Each structure stands twice: as structure tokens, then as C-alpha cells.
Amino acid sequence: MSEREASEPISEQGVSDNGDTFAAEGSQMKRRLSEVDGESRGAVDDALEGSNSDGDEDEDEDEDEDEDEDGEGPHKKQRRERNRFLDIEAEVSDDEEDDEDDEDSELVREGFITHGDEDEEEDDAQGSKDDRLHRQLDQDLQKSSEEDAQKLAKELRERYGRSSSKQYRAAAQDGYVPQRFMLPSVDTATVWGVRCRPGKEKDLVKKLLKKKFNLDKSMGSKKLKILSIFQRDSFSGRIYIEAPKQSVIEKFCNGVPDIYVNQKLLIPVQELPLLLKPSKSDDVRLEPGSYVRIKRGIYKGDLAVVEQLSDNNLECMLKVVPRLDYGKNDEVDPDTQQKKAKKVSFAQRPPPQLFNPTMALRMDQANLYKRDEKHFTYRNEDYIDGYLIKVFKIQYLKTANIHPTVEELARFGSKDGAVDLTTISQTIKKAQASKAMFQPGDRVEILNGEQRGSKGYVTRTSTDIISVSLTGFNAKPLGFPVSSLRKIFEPGDHVSVMSGDHQGDAGLVLIVKNGQVTFVSDQTRENLTISANNLTKSMDSTPTSSDYALHDIVELSAKNVACVIQAGHDIFKVLDDSGKVSTVTKGSILKKINTTRSRIAAVDGNGKEIKIGDTVVEKVGARREGQVLYVQSHQIFIVSKKIVENAGVFVVNPMNVEAVASRENLIASKLDLTKMNPEIAAKMGPPSQTAQPVSVGRDVALNKTVRIRSAGYKGQLGIVKDVNGDMATVELHSKNKHITVDKRKLTYFNHEGGDGITYDELVSRRGRMPHARLGPSYVSAPRTMATGAPGAAPALSGGMTPGWSYFDGGKTPAVGSHGAGAASAWGGASSWGGQGGGATSTWGGQPGNVSTWGGQTGATSTWGGASTWGNKSTWGGASTWASGGENGAASTWGGGDRSAYGGASTWGAAGGASAWGGNKSHHRPDGSNSTWGTAPQGNRSAWGDQPAGSGSSWGGAR
């Protein structure tokens, strides 16, 4: 091969700065290699050895070698020419660019880089430069990744360095790690439980994790020290954050909704294993086609099929049978006359039906949009193939123990309307197996397996496996699936239903055949056939429900009571006081009446008293006999053991029955040993008063005006409209409302007013209210006092002291006497009468002075001619204070001869005659002028009966 041929370029190739060589095309390599002789092959080996030589030689030595190679001539060129076909990867050189340029020039000079056209040389140089840059970039990336890995390893060692302890490694090698080695120390970060809104735990964990990443990016190297965030399904309403300090958590959670940062607690180190311990979740993994039930809204309890799950597994798209009314219940705005959709409540929701576009088009066309033949949008919701397609949150769905009924599965049939019978049978089988509940002691039979037909007793129960001790085997109990067991009952056993429509019903077993048990119900006296696994042995023959039992007396309304004749789980059959049988729900029953505290009694046809518990018999007709359950106003409830219909309960009028035996009479007829023992009788003390007899017939409180004394309506007035036992129905005056109040918490009034009385007082008075107190009405009656003068105000009825009527006598003092001389304080010349017959008026002074109230002369008294306190007065003859003022003759207590208490004044005309005698006067020096004297002057006393004293209040003659 010539030197020229060897120097010609074969293909695009070059040598990079770091020594990497790019190979030529494969076809040219084969052709060139075929021309290489043995001498050239040896040169290739020498070149390989030279390429692997030490790269740390000095530059001077390299230059000397280059000069020697130049002197060798063609031999050197051929050897370097062969290097064109070898891909030699050299180590990365860290020399400066000057050294790299020198090496390039040497390679060109030695023939490693062929000489071609100038364009080719430029292309080779540009390609080498690009390749060098790319390789340098790759090296930088690799270096940075190695640094990141080392940094991450360092962080892990710092955080979990405690796991590298010798004790932990030694324990791990043995296959057992003590729990104390797994507990964090006091130097590690603490876990805080932060309160949050229930149901938002998972959303908040994701939101906080995203916030953590954003803060780390924005803060650079100074990152927020939040180590972990998690939540547990078993601890609702809390999320857990691992951080070294409490302030870090407060800063981190600040501003995040649904988190209550102030309500947090530190989790003790001892409780961390329990907090992080994995537990079996009750949630079922949802897949397209799974059945779920909706927990809330108008579709609460409805079956739905999962169509699609969201990426975050928080929401899913469901296919639901819609409940639409197509705008029938919409409200119309009176202002705009536009329809407004009314929010449908759960109780008023329409029945489930597939979407009907024809009905929607006719009833509510404005809200209907057609997407395609099977896809419609109605009121912003999509309907495909008649089903509602809507997105629901998984937390509002029930995913476990979903057992669809045949009716529900029929709604989700195939496109042609057919129902998958296989799916239905499997669903029913699973539902029956899940409802089968076994208890220790139940006698069971094995249905499948090697022990098929064997019988035994249940010893232990679990969710799916039941431990059974087989009869006749002394071996330990064996475990069997729930589906392979069946309960065993014998005719005569008393059983009760555990679940289903007849839950709570009980009865006596009649027939057992093929796992089905037929028993007679204690409630309806009918035969019922129930699966054996849905029954359990019952010791109580009285069927009960959660709230009400058989033969309970319940209140349906304020005026209607009934007796329970069939008790279900939520539905009850009752017999009301009119004898009508009806079915009611638990919500329609107001309350249960406690018959043990009821004191209502009735009267039978013979006039005897009937109470609860007495035995009665009908006087006419079928002469049914039974025990009194409850006494109503005009009806009584009786239960008989000889009657099957209505659980033995019937209603009759108390007048159509007669008492056979009274429970109280039987108790009273028994011997009282306590009274026979004198020591016990002495300790008991004197006998107490007998209780008030219970009223019979119409209650005394009916139609009485009452005031309520209990809380809620305290102080309000009303009328008693009905009485039922101890409760009274009161119609309030303030508003048209009837309320039920204890009749002993009412105060009873007369309709005319007056003081109120209690119910016990009303019973003792036999319903008669005390009359209102009659007397002067100081509000409406005229204030003018009755007088004896014509035209005076009419007198009111008396009875009081002093009297107000001149027709009533015998008062003290006497009122209303006629006569001139015997004018009473209120009689004779009235206070408002004519001329003054007496002396100077109370208000009048000297003659000529006109009285305050007018008159003919100035001497006219303010209170009339015969002044109130004048000389014809009850108390004396002269004016109250004086006639002329010169002496005491006109004194209040004396002066005139007609004084009520004596002739001379108390203070004496000249000061001589005493009111009680003893002092001398100018008439009787011996002092016989006393009020009680016997002289003619003294006979004019108020107690005398002489003519001079006839004007006295107590005198007899005129």
C-alpha cells in the first residue's frame, strides 16, 4: 500500500481531546484490514502498547519521541495509519487547552488525522468540539448525581443512624428485634396530633405535602423541618405531623383551612407503636362494576354501580337509577313568574325510575339538552341509557357488605332488559351467608366436606370460621366456614327471628324441613316459615321491639290512645279506642303510657269501680272475659287469653261489663300480719289519713279556667278541654294551641275571677269553684258615698263595718238614720244638703262667710245643715271645733245636751263637768253629770232610752 493511499481519508472520523477515537464504516474497515500485512499487524500491536503507556510523562520526553518517530520514515506512518481502524478510549485528560492543542498538532503531524480538503478539516474540528462539549456535560451530570446520592445517604444516616447500633444489628441477625429498639429517643423529632375537620384527613395530608414541597423550593437551602405527615382511618378528625418543635407545626399549618392548629396534642413515645401499628381496613377496594350504596342526599340508601375511579382514589363516577319529578313540584316566583326548582327532601323523594326524555320534554323542556341518541343533559346532570351518571366522593359511599336485592339488580339489567340470574343467585347466597349469625351453644349440622351430616355444638365464633365440637368425637373443635353450617331446631322449641321483615317475632316450632322452620307466631297466631340460620332459641315468649312491646298502651295523639297488638322493628299494628285496627310507624307514636302509675277508674254496669288489673266479663253478647289493660274515658282495653284475634285485645264500654274480681280486693282480703304485731304497730305511729278517693266519671277539671304553673307556658291562661289520666289538654287563651300539662300543675279559677285553688282542693270541693267576693268595685263603682238625702247615690250592699247602705241596721256606728234631731253622721241633712241648721261650719267661721261648697248663708256648714260633727252629730251637739270659740260649750265632746257620751263637754264649758263624772258642774255640784249617771242629764247618754237620748245611735225612742 502506498503512502498516499494510507494518508487518504477513508470516512468521517476524528480524535477527541480526551483521546476517544471514532471508527470508520464497517465495509471500508473490512477492505482496509484485508490489505494489512503481517508487518502492519505488528505495528498495530506496538500502537496498542503505546496507547496504554503512562500519561504522566513529561512534555520534553514526548517531544523527543516524536522526533525519533519522524526519523523512522514510512514505517512510522504505516503504523499510525493502522490506528485509524481502532476505537481506543483514553482516560479523561485534565490538562489545559494549550496542552490539548499541542497534542492535536502532534497527531496531525504523525498521521493520526488525515489531510484532506480544507472544508473537511473544518468539519472535523467542529465535530470534535461539539463532541467534547457533550461529553463534558455528561460528565458534569454524572458528577452531580453522585454528589446528590452521597448527600442523600448522609441525610439517611443522620436521621436513622440509631438503626446501625450493634444491639439492633445483632438482634436483627437473630431474626427478632425488640420493640424498645424501634422506639424513638428523646433526641428525635416528636409526633403531634392536630385536630381537623372529620372527613378531610386525606385531603389535608395531600394539601400539606404539596405545601411542603413548594416551601422547600422557595426557601432554598433553609428548608422547613417537617419530617412526615400522615393520618389513620381509625382516628377520625386528626392528622399527625412529625416535627422537632411545636412552633414549626404552627407556622406550617397557619392559614390552611379545616385545620385547628390550637387543638393539638403531643403523642407520647409509648403510644407511637400503637399509632403506627397497621390494622385491617374495612374498606373494600373499588373497581369498575362494583356495587356501592350512597350514604347521603336524595339517593341515600340507593344502589349504584361504579363506572370509573379518579386518579387520586377520592372520587368515583357512579351509575344510579334517577329519582325525578320532572318539575311537578317546582315553585313559581310571584314576581318573575318563573319556575324555581324546589329542593326535594328525603321523605318526599320520587320513586326510582329510568330517565324518560319524553316526560322531560313535555314537562320541563327548557332544562333538557340532547347530546346523542342515548345521552341527555337534564338540569346540568348527565343521563346515559336512562341512568344518572354522576361523580360522588368515596367517603360518602358505603362499600362493604353490599347485598343488592332482586328488584335492585333488575333495574341494572343488561341492555336488552334481561337479568343476570347467576349474579342474583350469588348475591342472595352471599347475603344469606352474611346474615347467618351463630352463637356459642347453638346446635348445628355440617352440610359440606368430609364431616357432611355430622352434628355438633358451636364453641367459638369469628367472622368467617366457626369452631364446632362434633358429637361423639373427643378431638378438639374443628373449624368450618359459615356457609357450610346450618342450625338445628326441634319441634316444640321456642324461637325468635333475628333479622328480616319478621324481626323480633317469636313462636313455637311446628315443622322443620330442609333447613326451613315453620312456627306459630305469638303475635298473629299465624304460621311463619323462616330459614333456620335466621332463628335463635328464645326463652321469652313475649315478642318485643326496640321501643314498644306487645300489649303496650301508646298515645297516637292528644285524644287518641291505642294498644299494640303486633310489634315489629319499625312498624306496629295497633288497636285504638274505637276498636279500629291500623298499622303505624314508630315515628307516628307520641309516647308510651305508663299504666302502673295511672289512677283512672271507671264504673261497670252494676256501679262497681273498675281499675287496671281487674278481671271483668261482658254482660251481653259473647260474654268475653279478660283483664283490664287500660281505662279510657268511655272505653276500656281488655286482654283475654281465650281470644286469638288481635292478640286477645278488645275494646268495650265499661257499662257493658261487670267486675268479677278486683285486684285491690284480693290484696285487702289478705291477712295483715304487721297490724297484728303490737311492736311493729307502735313503731309505725298513728295511722295516717286515708287517701282521697279517685273520682269516677267526668273529671272535675274539665272546662275549668286554669293558669299553668309548669315551665314553658308558666303564667298563661287557658281552658281544660280534655283530661286523660294525670294529663290535661289545655287550650291557651293567648294563641290557638292545645298543650298537654299535668293537671296537678294547674291553678283553677272561677270564670268570674277570684283566688285560685289546686286540683286536690277542687276534688275535695267536688268540682265547685269558690264564688267571687262581692263588694264595692273600686274601679268601676261610683265613689259618691250613700247618704239619706233624696237624690243621693244608690247605696251598695252592706255586710261590712261601717255599712254603706241605709237599709242595713245593726252596725257600729249606725248609719243612715232619718230625723232632724237624730241626724246621723251620714244621715239627716246630707253632707251635700241644704241650709245649715247647726252652728258654725267646720270650714265656716263667722256669719256672712260663705261656705266652701256654697249655701244660702255663711253659717251653712261645709257638710250640710246638721253638720257631720255638729250638735246633732253622733259625737256631740256643737261643731267639731267651736261655735264661737269663747268657751268649751261647743267642744267636740260636749257642749250640747244631746252628746252621745254625756251632757257636759269632756273639757267642760267652764272646765267643771268630767266626761265620766266626779267633777262638779253648775247643774249638779255632786258630779252626777257623768256619762254613766242616773240623773236626767245623764240619761241622755248613748245607752239611755229616755226621750232626750232618743237621738243617740243606740237609743230606742225618737
From Swiss-Prot:
Residues 32-44 have a biased composition (Basic and acidic residues). Residues 871-882, 927-940 have a biased composition (Polar residues). It is found in: Nucleus. Keywords: mRNA processing, Nucleus, Transcription. Residues 1-131, 825-891, 911-958 are annotated as: Disordered. Residues 830-839 have a biased composition (Gly residues). InterPro entries: KOW, KOW_Spt5_1, KOW_Spt5_2, KOW_Spt5_3, KOW_Spt5_4, KOW_Spt5_5, NGN-domain, NGN-like_dom. It holds the Pfam family KOWx_SPT5. GO terms for molecular function: chromatin-protein adaptor activity; DNA binding; histone binding; mRNA binding; RNA polymerase I core binding; RNA polymerase I general transcription initiation factor binding; RNA polymerase II complex binding; rRNA binding. Its main location: nucleus. The keyword Transcription applies. The keyword Transcription applies. Residues 54-71, 88-105 have a biased composition (Acidic residues). One of its GO terms (biological process) is transcription elongation-coupled chromatin remodeling. It comes from the Eukaryota. GO terms for cellular component: DSIF complex; rDNA heterochromatin. Residues 851-870 have a biased composition (Low complexity). Belongs to the SPT5 family. Component of the SPT4-SPT5 complex. Interacts with RNA polymerase II. The SPT4-SPT5 complex mediates both activation and inhibition of transcription elongation, and plays a role in pre-mRNA processing. This complex seems to be important for the stability of the RNA polymerase II elongation machinery on the chromatin template but not for the inherent ability of this machinery to translocate down the gene. This is Transcription elongation factor SPT5. It comes from Eremothecium gossypii (strain ATCC 10895 / CBS 109.51 / FGSC 9923 / NRRL Y-1056) (Yeast).
